[in-house]
Amino acid sequence: METTNMNNPIDSDKVDKLKEKCKWACTKPEKIQKKEGKKISEQRKEQENAEKEWGNNMIGQSNNGQWTTLLGEGLVRDILELRGENPRKPERKGGFEPDWETDDYMYEVKTSNWWVAGTAGEKVLGTWIKYQDIPTLYNKPLKIVCVANQEYELEYGKVKYFGDNVSEKTKKILELARTWEIEYIKFSDLIPNNYK
């Protein structure tokens, strides 16, 4: 039996499920290749449906179109517990209710599935502006956790918040966010090595 921290033992099934979720969050699927007799769009739809079915299974639901929200929030909570950070639901303040509060931080979770198309993830770019008052309202810094494709897109997509290729303009914006006690973080950086 493994333990999440010194006080909370968890069973091996829960550990295996958590590792499976972490692997999903940190592993970009391979690019779809042309196959004879099957269009790329058909393959993409199959992958999208398979991911949705898997995600719904992970959250104990079926056909929930917003499964990534519940999966990402639950996954971050589990990892925060594993790290001994005492996550809990915060009380609503100033019309806001971030996803998690710990003893030292507030957390807002932004998750995007791997087969999402278009500009669905772009709203995360302005999350720090929307939640600018959270550090003052809760008297704790805010960490915006980017999970799965959301993390990938912010490291390898058009607008980079992570990695070596962040533009000078974006660095200035992220520095301004830090002066407000707001920081974007990669989910993969939260995960203990034995769960990757």
Model-derived regions, located:
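Beta-rich catalytic cores
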Residues: 96
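Soluble or luminal CAZymes and related metallo-dependent hydrolases
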Residues: 68-72, 119, 123-126, 165, ...
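Domain-level recognition of nuclease-like catalytic cores that cleave nucleotide substrates
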Residues: 143-196
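Catalytic cores of nucleic-acid endonucleases
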Residues: 111-162
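Acidic-basic catalytic patches of nuclease active cores, encompassing PD-(D/E)XK
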Residues: 2-89
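Core catalytic machinery and nucleic-acid-binding channels of phosphodiester-processing enzymes
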Residues: 90-91, 99
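Conserved catalytic cores of phosphodiester-cleaving nucleases, focusing on short active-site segments
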Residues: 100-113
